[in-house]
Amino acid sequence: MKTLPSILSAFALLLTFAQPASAAEVVVGLGTFDFDDDGAVVDLEYHTDPITSFRGADVSFAVVLSADTKSDIFIGAGVSAVRQIGDSPWFVEGSFAPGFFFEGSEETDLGQTLEFRTLIGVGRRFDNNYSLSLAASHLSNGGLSDFNPGVNAITLRLRRSF
């Protein structure tokens, strides 16, 4: 958990150099997580049209569905923020989504069903409709349970704006 403040600080710093971008999006991510070396995770997200702007970042509601090769499922809803970096095609993204984690085995017990997913990433827009990003996410119960191992994932994310 000591790395979370560092990640949030880096995200805040990146936001200071970025400019807003907007559109509703569907995001599909594929990556790996730290339960073992050969585990894979697939994320599916929907981000609404921006509901507000905060420090130049477009903030949207987000719905998240994540499944992995250990038969774990996370379903959550929260907020997502995306900000263009200057006039370039590059952007930074971040999100926070509380939700429900359904473990597929005792090996992936995270302490309780209520979990929180945080995500930070950097990406590039290729046109008005498609972009690709690399993101790191963390799933944890935030210390609400005595047992709180958390899990990290790295995903390559394809975004489709409409």
What are these regions (language model features)?
Residues 1-24:
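Cleavable N-terminal export/targeting peptides
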Residues 20-24, 50-59, 84-92, 129:
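Short loop/turn motifs that connect adjacent beta-strands in outer-membrane beta-barrel proteins
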Residues 25-34, 56-69, 94-100, 134-140:
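Transmembrane beta-strand segments that form the barrel wall of outer-membrane beta-barrel proteins
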Residues 28, 42-46, 77-79, 120, ...:
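Membrane-embedded beta-strands of outer-membrane beta-barrel proteins
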Residues 32-42, 65-76, 86, 113, ...:
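Solvent-exposed loop/turn segments connecting transmembrane beta-strands
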Residues 38-44, 149-162:
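Outer-membrane beta-barrel "beta-signal"
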Residues 46-48, 81-85, 124, 138, ...:
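Residue-level signature of outer-membrane beta-barrel architecture
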Residues 90-121:
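Mid-chain, well-packed structural core segment of small domains
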